Amino acid sequence: MGNNGSTRAARKPSGKPSRKKPADGVSRRALLIGGGAVAAAGTAALLARDQVKRLWWQVPGVEKPRKPGELDYAGATWVAASEANWRRADRPDDFPIDRVIIHVTQGSFASAVKVFQDPAHQAATHYIVGQDGRVVQMIRELDVAYQAGNRSFNERAVGIEHEGFVDRPKDLTKAMYASSARLTASICARHGIPIDREHIIGHVEVPGTDHTDPGPHWDWDRYMELVRRAAAAPPSPTPSPSAKA
């Protein structure tokens, strides 16, 4: 987990976090909208009306439409995190997404859900995966979760918590590995993230963090192979994002 923190995550000496300048979506100069019409540059319009209807939300500062309880991953159940534990954003148009960060909860599935709903915790991840393979989504992927202890990595990453403790290898179950791998493959497909260890990382690998999860017992070779297999499998017919009542 990140703090910004964690429940009781193992820690290491801290360093200085890096910062990254946000990337805009469509340039303000490239997309001119006024009174519902497209501004003309010389004799040619910059964009046709039908393009504007599709792209208006990509103008920096304009958000995509949202629905309560909307999911980015069809295999998850929605449980909302406290708004104090994340920041509203419009990714990937304001911040490109190019990392998946693997965390371990240092506690139970229920305790992780509880602390992410606590505004005093000041940290959360987008997803939690249980030892039985269940997945809960608590923050939309387009929003910034306070997960990594590093602003740049918060803005560029999707975070996944895994139920258990870093010093208990038995907590890293077959069902959890398989479920998490399917989730990570789905995230990578949505955002064009390469499936490699440069882009799928542990919390311990975030610059400046004081955490050590997912710990020495996390089997990276096994996990990456499962992610690759999941990515190569036929896609689910269920569209994403989806919404559950």
Regions found by a protein language model. Give the residues of each.
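A cross-domain feature marking catalytic cores of carbohydrate-active enzymes
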Residues: 104, 162, 204
